[in-house]
Amino acid sequence: MELLQLWSALIILVVTYTISLLINQWRKPKPQGKFPPGPPKLPLIGHLHLLWGKLPQHALASVAKEYGPVAHVQLGEVFSVVLSSREATKEAMKLVDPACANRFESIGTRIMWYDNEDIIFSPYSEHWRQMRKICVSELLSSRNVRSFGFIRQDEVSRLLRHLRSSAGAAVDMTERIETLTCSIICRAAFGSVIRDNAELVGLVKDALSMASGFELADMFPSSKLLNLLCWNKSKLWRMRRRVDTILEAIVDEHKFKKSGEFGGEDIIDVLFRMQKDTQIKVPITTNSIKAFIFDTFSAGTETSSTTTLWVLAELMRNPAVMAKAQAEVRAALKEKTNWDVDDVQELKYMKSVVKETMRMHPPIPLIPRSCREECVVNGYTIPNKARIMINVWSMGRNPLYWEKPDTFWPERFDQVSKDFMGNDFEFVPFGAGRRICPGLNFGLANVEVPLAQLLYHFDWKLAEGMKPSDMDMSEAEGLTGILKNNLLLVPTPYDPSS
């Protein structure tokens, strides 16, 4: 009898809560205007059922095929718009860019990025402009990217030594590439490799997997109950406390240390100095500095390592492309002992391989934006605070823009002059407009330089007798489009004299 009463009370609670949500939705003022078309929606959940069991970029690509390049999807309470064409993306990222320049906030970003005091997820504001300007001038300028060359060479040499010692055995390249990228970024930005390097990489991956804005509580932001019951929230706070401990140690170390690896200021020293400057427009808090550090790890490590791993995976699946890329690298660099950014500029085919990889596997498949004010895109009204998702993954596989879009074919870039610098809006893996990735050149150097070394110094085969056709090329869920499974490869040292 007591069990029956308990179930009855639970059912009454769920029904009452559902009715209250429906009433709130009915009472909510409806935006006015000509809105984008979209599929029929269900009460309460809208179009959430379309995402179940699928990666969001895949599900939303199907919506665009039926309803057009500017499509409306109702994700619970959140009015959302999917952009899947060059023209719509150009309007949102260039013509009405200021109106669409906010980021969509999620529970994950608010908790892990210190209430979005960072650069990636910060609203478009004076704080964002100030922090981005400091980041670009002190860390990510072309001059600085070149000055970090000896760090890249040192860390890549460390990786090559490890691979030579493991010759003939399967190596977890996912782990090795993530460690390499993280070490380069730590030394360039913070002056040294941190002790908790591996743990922080793991925390970054978990944070990004939970920051995509597809948690149930993100879809019903007005629901205090869902916000309270969000099971991921407690996990996020546990992660945040551990991240905070690691970042606090980095901050404390810089408070008592006057110089980094270069014998001068690193970016954290600059932020501390500017924190004391009474002339800056927006005060820099300690949380802002921590959020910036976490930004550097998450944006720098995850996107660069993701792209490098996808390149290696595609090369293993396409042996003819691998042979052509290795032949180019070995012919161009055989007389050089060390090389960096300027040297890889002559590797035209390898650079096309990287481009083709980012076309098929963009580091951020769905670029998140949010409206700061009502605007019009392709003739459709996008209301204030609407969530905008630019489906970079879908545009990269659209036959309107790409011949044989499902084929890995780097030679296509011999025939077209498309680049990813934010000018060709069907190909924006780094974004475009005001919020284009500020670390584009830094990230690209951290992909191309190690990749050239790996192709030059080793021949590669798949582990455990696998064939290219056996490879699992699935993507994991999350904000970044990482390989679902770790990439295991067997290196064999290359002898130039042979």
From Swiss-Prot:
It catalyses: (4S)-limonene + reduced [NADPH--hemoprotein reductase] + O2 = (1S,6R)-isopiperitenol + oxidized [NADPH--hemoprotein reductase] + H2O + H(+). InterPro entries: CYP450_71D, Cyt_P450, Cyt_P450_CS, Cyt_P450_E_grp-I, Cyt_P450_sf. GO terms for cellular component: endoplasmic reticulum membrane. Its cofactor is heme. PROSITE patterns: CYTOCHROME_P450. It is found in: Endoplasmic reticulum membrane. CDD domains: CYP71-like. SUPFAM superfamilies: Cytochrome P450. GO terms for molecular function: (S)-limonene 3-monooxygenase activity; heme binding; iron ion binding. The chain crosses the membrane at residues 3-23. It comes from the Eukaryota. This is Cytochrome P450 71D15.
